[in-house]
Amino acid sequence: MESSFIFGCVAEKMTSAIPDDKNWYLKGSFDKANRTSVEAPRGPGIYDSIDIFEDIKEKFTNIKITTDIHEPWQAEKLRHIVDMIQVPAFLCRQTDLIRECAHNFDVINVKKGQWMDPGSMRHVVEKIRYYNEDAKVYITERGTQFGYDRVIVDYRAVDIMKEFCDGVILDCTHSTQQLGQGTTGGNRNLAKAYVKTAREFGYDGIFAETHPAPDTAISDKDSQIDLEWMASVINTI
């Protein structure tokens, strides 16, 4: 989440583009805790972000908010304002983090670790339901490690993971990432193709980073999708 202004721009544009009967979440990260460079901006922090989330919900009453957490104590702080909590891919096996997510939230989205096979995600879902048997659990595919510096999407994973979770989401932007020297690259055109074709491969939904001016984005600028384009196609997929 670069700023409250940009977050508000995305909220306004997507709210006007998506019908009220569609199930969607506005996502903003309060802390980009795994930036490639120690000098890279990380975000506004949890407490300022809670204020931003509250302002957005007051202005757009039909919006549901999601964010990701990195430490167990953060779950309790967010439970009153966040509708779905996200477990980052790098942390998807951390039992203490998963426990606190399950104790504080009934809707949980787990990003599949880039190194994990689809079937192994069953154990992550079982952990969540051990602590909250009524939790609705989604798994987000964000690519599988392919060599040292890139990820690819294995479409065979969809049906495997659907057997033990409530829905499988395709992360259209992070799934194009290419690791670099101090920055993370990506492929915006490929991300757009994923947006358009995810349904054909059986995904239940999409996750995508969008920005009013992607080339100026502080994070993941090579894979972020232009906000105008996203708003124009969201109801055609």
Model regions: which residues?
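Surface-exposed amphipathic alpha-helices with a cationic face
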Residues: 15, 19, 53-59, 102, ...
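Conserved beta-strand positions in the central sheet of alpha/beta enzyme cores
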Residues: 25-27, 66, 86, 109, ...
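Catalytic alpha/beta core domains of metabolic enzymes, predominantly
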Residues: 105-210
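Conserved N-terminal beta1-alpha1 strand-loop-helix module at the mouth
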Residues: 1-52, 58
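Active-site-adjacent loop and "lid" segments of alpha/beta metabolic enzymes
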Residues: 38-47, 86-91, 148-152, 175-199, ...
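A short alpha/beta connector and helix-capping loop motif
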Residues: 7-16, 80-90, 95-104, 179-213
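Catalytic beta/alpha-barrel core
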Residues: 44-45, 60-74, 83-97, 106-118, ...
